[in-house]
Curated annotation (Swiss-Prot):
Domain of life, source organism: Bacteria
Keywords on record: Cell membrane, Membrane, Protein transport, Translocation, Transmembrane, Transmembrane helix, Transport
Principal localisation: membrane
NCBIfam families: PRK14861.1, tatAE
Function: Part of the twin-arginine translocation (Tat) system that transports large folded proteins containing a characteristic twin-arginine motif in their signal peptide across membranes. TatA could form the protein-conducting channel of the Tat system.
PANTHER family: SEC-INDEPENDENT PROTEIN TRANSLOCASE PROTEIN TATA
One Pfam family it belongs to: TatA_B_E
InterPro entries referenced in this protein's UniProt entry, alphabetically: TatA/B/E (IPR003369), TatA/E (IPR006312)
Annotated protein name in UniProt: Sec-independent protein translocase protein TatA
């Protein structure tokens, strides 16, 4: 999905976010995004581990 976005596209997105939210909100947005990604990775790992355990259990 995002594979076609190059460096100029990322710069454009960052400028748009800066204009929309302002420089004071960026740290809050970054923190929230980081926490969301961390939780997503944790959930994905848990699901993968569960699936692997089920697979091993059914052998």
């Amino acid at each position: 999905m995002f594979s076609n976005i190059g460096f100029p596209g990322l710069i454009l997105i960052l400028v748009a976010v800066l204009i929309l939210f302002g420089p004071k909100k960026l740290p809050e947005i970054g923190k929230a995004l980081g926490e969301t990604l961390k939780e997503f990775k944790k959930s994905t790992k848990e699901l993968t581990d569960e699936a692997f355990q089920e697979k091993e259990k059914n052998k």
